[in-house]
Amino acid sequence: LIAVLDRLFYSSHFDKTMKVGASVVCARRGGCSATFDELNKYFTIANMPIASSQYWNSIHGRGPGEASEDEEGKQTMRVLARNMAFLMKSIALGKEQFGLPEAEEHVWTHFIR
């Protein structure tokens, strides 16, 4: 997945500004928070708002069908879906009424200049 996202975010030239992103991760046990963090970095580097939920967007399960038994994870996904839909509608309305925020020309530095 990371290889695909590298290609999509660094090699493609379509504007991703103000397109809503949301990461969803699934694991047997540990590793969700680190993966969630890594995936969200793609959105933040591309001027994309991130939809959130009531907890990190993760669900747990090892084998086929096990994730469907994670009640808290399923609730997190439902809340995420509603929040993402609201955020997308809000951005569309704001864009229609106020336009997009003014873009600045990107300045490249090496942390000291």
Question: PLM ranges: what are they?
Answer:
Residues 49-113:
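Glycine-rich phosphate/pyrophosphate-binding loop and the adjoining helix
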Residues 1-55:
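Helix-loop-strand module that forms the ligand-binding subsite of alpha/beta enzymes
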